[in-house]
UniProtKB/Swiss-Prot annotation:
This is 7-cyano-7-deazaguanine synthase. It comes from the Bacteria. Zn(2+) binds at residues 197, 206, 209, 212. Keywords: ATP-binding, Ligase, Metal-binding, Nucleotide-binding, Queuosine biosynthesis, Zinc. Its cofactor is Zn(2+). NCBIfam families: 7-cyano-7-deazaguanine synthase QueC. Its EC number is 6.3.4.20. It catalyses: 7-carboxy-7-deazaguanine + NH4(+) + ATP = 7-cyano-7-deazaguanine + ADP + phosphate + H2O + H(+). It is an enzyme of class 6 (ligase). The gene is queC. SUPFAM superfamilies: Adenine nucleotide alpha hydrolases-like. ATP binds at residues 13-23. The keyword Mitochondrion does not apply.
């Protein structure tokens, strides 16, 4: 009997809670996962080392880090140390405004890199861990953005023109953070290794930035112990 061809997918992996859960979902879905992390000049580079560990732990086929320096443009607290990372924002503020931690065009750039990697691999699937429920209000984490990028990929690539359009999977898009934590826990995600914090202190999560607040909320609402060591209790 002929061997069935391997299903390959590129998984954007930051080393945080969402993207790591997304990797576990891709593996559950039967894909050979090719993880792509991007060093875009972020101040929280510690996540890249976590991503490598997590890719191995969850059985990825490989893990690649690509450098694209978005800090050259500035404009975000995540790439410019002169801009303070907001701490202690309320849920109402998160819903009402786009914070200074938004990195201009970041997800457009990351998905473009994933698209290029997928096309060279002969993969037709990309997984991304964006979320539009418990999130910081970024415009490039919304369903309309993902649909638009998928259409772009169809007309912008050799594969798409030849009738093999790219599929973008965003399995966490409409889950609460608690739902994401429950899903990842059921799939064996080692959350103690993940790092979500925007402003870590000597490798430890600050406990007060948007990412930490949402992470803590997710574990609390899921009723699952949070293994994270926070600087601010």
């Amino acid at each position: 009997m002929a061997k069935r061809p391997t299903k390959r997918a590129v998984v954007l992996l930051s080393g945080g809670l969402d993207s790591t859960t997304c990797l576990a979902v891709a593996r559950r879905d039967g894909f050979e996962a090719h993880c792509l992390s991007v060093d875009y000049g972020q101040r929280h580079k510690g996540e890249l080392a976590r991503a490598r560990r997590l890719s191995r732990a969850l059985g990825a086929a490989d893990h690649r880090v690509v450098k694209v320096d978005l800090s050259a443009f500035g404009g975000s607290a995540l790439t410019d140390r002169a801009i303070a990372v907001p701490k202690g924002r309320s849920g109402r503020r998160r819903a009402a405004e786009i914070p200074v931690t938004y990195v201009p065009a970041r997800n457009t750039v990351l998905l473009a890199l994933a698209l290029a990697h997928a096309e060279t691999l002969g993969a037709e699937d990309v997984y991304v861990g964006v979320n539009a429920i418990d999130y910081s209000g970024y415009p490039d984490c919304r369903p309309a953005f993902l649909r638009a990028f998928e259409r772009l990929a169809t007309v912008a690539t050799k594969a798409g023109v030849e009738g093999r359009p790219l599929r973008i999977h965003a399995p966490l898009l409409r889950l609460t953070k608690a739902g994401i934590v429950r899903l990842g826990t059921s799939l064996g995600v080692p959350y103690r290794v993940t790092l979500s914090c925007y402003d870590p202190v000597r490798g430890r999560a600050c406990g007060a930035c948007d990412a930490c607040v949402l992470r803590r909320k997710g574990f609390a609402e899921a009723g699952i112990p949070d293994p994270t060591l926070y600087v601010q209790k």
